[in-house]
């Protein structure tokens, strides 16, 4: 079995491609079932965020498994595989393990060290378990990645002062208008990203904020989190009226198609309007920029803001790298030790069978008058002897770091004791 990751990210693909390959949580069960239906895919987990879609898998044959995952991605994005391939990356074995740990630690994020990705890795692990995508290898790997992500944030300073996508979006708005306090601001959507937008806007002095949401309940739930802020609440049918009055509009919804485009905006009485779309799939169609006075920015435009933050964080990232290597090594040692399990189990089973047979012979010779408590003593004695004899060889076998040396030992045990073993994971 081999571990692979195939995917794309903000480093390899523009948002116009990433939005085509975004998998909503409601569709994750179908995606995992589809991937598991391929003949060479044994385990699977999916991380889907605004900046990445990554398929982690345990495959029987690396080349065939990777080909099947690429086919799935092409079908999901409704793209020709030849066109899609230039945006994909593939990592195998140790590199795939290291990549997941780097993702969980925030080292692969657009915003170096951002904390939201760890929650997204946890969610991917939970969904993988829930939809029966995970087996022994990926379950352990994701748990190790989550542990590594927590360690990086608690044992290094990489998370200190890190900007998020939401805070970067607010920084971008401030760069464009200087003073947010005199701007009419609208946020379309009332999810977690919108909550963070409100938080950062208020901290930057914004006073006139309107929340537009599909459901009144969602908007009210968001407003309750900011009891000291006078948030205006509107429902989706009022969206265009709100946009017409706004100076800056942030969009952050789960819509799979654009909710704003040129056709909807061109007849509005707009003077100047800044649209900042932090959703993937995109909420705002690119053709709105054909309207005079409208400026559109999507998540890829945030790199301008992030660049100011990155240089000071590089040194912190180096500290995190060393810590992650420890976690990678721990996982690899565990994975390699699985190779010994069938042989050890077979040896213990064979020795235990011999012990039981010989004990039964001895007790039958001693006769029925032999007291039960004495039988228990002999039972305990023989088990103890077996455990003592097997303990050191098993410990040494598991601890052997040299792969070839370990395989020679395994083959020797199998030959000397005539063991029948099942194939290891």
Curated annotation (Swiss-Prot):
Its function, per the record, reads: Catalyzes the NADPH-dependent reduction of glutamyl-tRNA(Glu) to glutamate 1-semialdehyde (GSA).
Q: Does the keyword Glycosyltransferase apply?
A: no
| Annotated catalytic residues | 50
**Oligomer status and interactors:** Homodimer.
Q: Which organism is it from?
A: Picosynechococcus sp. (strain ATCC 27264 / PCC 7002 / PR-6) (Agmenellum quadruplicatum)
Alphabetical list of NCBIfam families matching this protein: hemA (TIGR01035), PRK00045.1-3 (NF000744)
> Which pathway is it part of?
Porphyrin-containing compound metabolism; protoporphyrin-IX biosynthesis; 5-aminolevulinate from L-glutamyl-tRNA(Glu): step 1/2; Porphyrin-containing compound metabolism; chlorophyll biosynthesis
UniProt GO MF annotations: glutamyl-tRNA reductase activity; NADP binding
Task: Detail which positions bind substrate.
Answer: 49-52, 109, 114-116, 120
Q: What protein name is recorded for this chain?
A: Glutamyl-tRNA reductase
Task: Give the stretches traversing the membrane.
Answer: none
Keyword Lipoprotein included in the entry's annotation: no
Family to which the UniProt record says this protein belongs: Belongs to the glutamyl-tRNA reductase family.
Q: Where is this site: Important for activity?
A: 99
Query: Where, by residue number, does NADP(+) bind?
Result: 189-194
The domain of life for this entry's organism is Bacteria
Query: What additional remark is attached to this entry?
Result: During catalysis, the active site Cys acts as a nucleophile attacking the alpha-carbonyl group of tRNA-bound glutamate with the formation of a thioester intermediate between enzyme and glutamate, and the concomitant release of tRNA(Glu). The thioester intermediate is finally reduced by direct hydride transfer from NADPH, to form the product GSA.
* Reactions mediated catalytically: (S)-4-amino-5-oxopentanoate + tRNA(Glu) + NADP(+) = L-glutamyl-tRNA(Glu) + NADPH + H(+)
Q: Which GO terms describe its biological process?
A: chlorophyll biosynthetic process; protoporphyrinogen IX biosynthetic process
Q: Which keywords does this Swiss-Prot/TrEMBL entry list? A: Chlorophyll biosynthesis, NADP, Oxidoreductase, Porphyrin biosynthesis
The EC code for this enzyme is 1.2.1.70
Q: What is known of its domains?
A: Possesses an unusual extended V-shaped dimeric structure with each monomer consisting of three distinct domains arranged along a curved 'spinal' alpha-helix. The N-terminal catalytic domain specifically recognizes the glutamate moiety of the substrate. The second domain is the NADPH-binding domain, and the third C-terminal domain is responsible for dimerization.
Do you know which Gene3D superfamilies this protein is assigned to?
Glutamyl-tRNA reductase, N-terminal domain, NAD(P)-binding Rossmann-like Domain
Q: What class of enzyme is it?
A: oxidoreductase
- InterPro entries assigned: 4pyrrol_synth_GluRdtase, 4pyrrol_synth_GluRdtase_dimer, 4pyrrol_synth_GluRdtase_N, GluRdtase_CS, GluRdtase_dimer_dom_sf, GluRdtase_N_sf, NAD(P)-bd_dom_sf, Shikm_DH/Glu-tRNA_Rdtase
Read off the Pfam families from this record.
GlutR_dimer, GlutR_N, Shikimate_DH
């Amino acid at each position: 079995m081999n571990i692979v990751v195939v995917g794309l990210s903000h480093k390899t693909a523009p948002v116009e491609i990433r939005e085509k390959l975004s998998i909503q949580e409601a569709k994750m069960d179908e995606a995992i079932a589809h991937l598991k239906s391929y003949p060479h895919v044994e385990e699977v987990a999916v991380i889907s965020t605004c900046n990445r879609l990554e398929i982690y898998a345990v495959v029987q044959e690396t080349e065939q498994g990777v080909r099947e995952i690429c086919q799935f991605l092409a079908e999901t994005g409704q793209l020709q595989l030849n066109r899609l391939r230039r945006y994909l990356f593939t990592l195998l074995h140790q590199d795939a393990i290291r990549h997941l740990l780097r993702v969980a630690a925030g080292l692969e994020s657009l915003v170096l060290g951002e904390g939201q990705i760890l929650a997204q890795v946890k969610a991917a692990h939970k969904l993988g378990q829930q939809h029966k995508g995970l087996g022994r290898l990926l379950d352990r790997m994701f748990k190790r990645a989550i542990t590594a992500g927590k360690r990086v944030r608690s044992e290094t300073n990489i998370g200190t002062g890190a900007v998020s996508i939401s805070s970067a979006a607010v920084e971008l708005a401030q760069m464009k208008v200087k003073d947010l306090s005199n701007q009419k601001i609208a946020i379309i959507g009332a999810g977690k990203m919108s909550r963070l937008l409100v938080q950062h806007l208020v901290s930057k002095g914004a006073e006139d904020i309107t929340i537009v949401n599909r459901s009144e309940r969602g908007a009210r739930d968001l407003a309750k989190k900011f009891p000291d802020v006078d948030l205006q609440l509107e429902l989706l049918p009022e969206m265009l009226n709100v946009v017409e009055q706004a100076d800056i509009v942030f969009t952050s919804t789960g819509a799979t198609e654009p909710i704003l485009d040129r056709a909807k905006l061109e007849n509005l009485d707009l003077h100047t309007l800044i649209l900042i779309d932090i959703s993937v799939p995109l909420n705002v169609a690119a053709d709105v920029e054909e309207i005079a006075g409208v400026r559109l920015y999507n998540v890829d435009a945030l790199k301008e803001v992030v660049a100011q933050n990155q240089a000071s964080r590089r040194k912190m990232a180096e500290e995190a790298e060393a810590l992650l290597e420890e976690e990678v090594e721990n996982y690899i040692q565990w994975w390699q030790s699985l190779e010994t399990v069938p042989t050890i189990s077979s040896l213990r089973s064979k020795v235990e069978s011999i012990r039981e047979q010989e004990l039964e012979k001895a007790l039958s010779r001693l006769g029925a008058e032999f007291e039960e408590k004495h039988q228990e003593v002999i039972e305990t004695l023989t088990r103890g002897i077996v455990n003592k004899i097997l303990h050191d060889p098993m410990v040494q076998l598991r601890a052997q770091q040299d792969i070839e040396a370990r395989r020679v030992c395994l083959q020797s045990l199998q030959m000397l004791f005539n063991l029948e073993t099942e194939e290891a994971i």
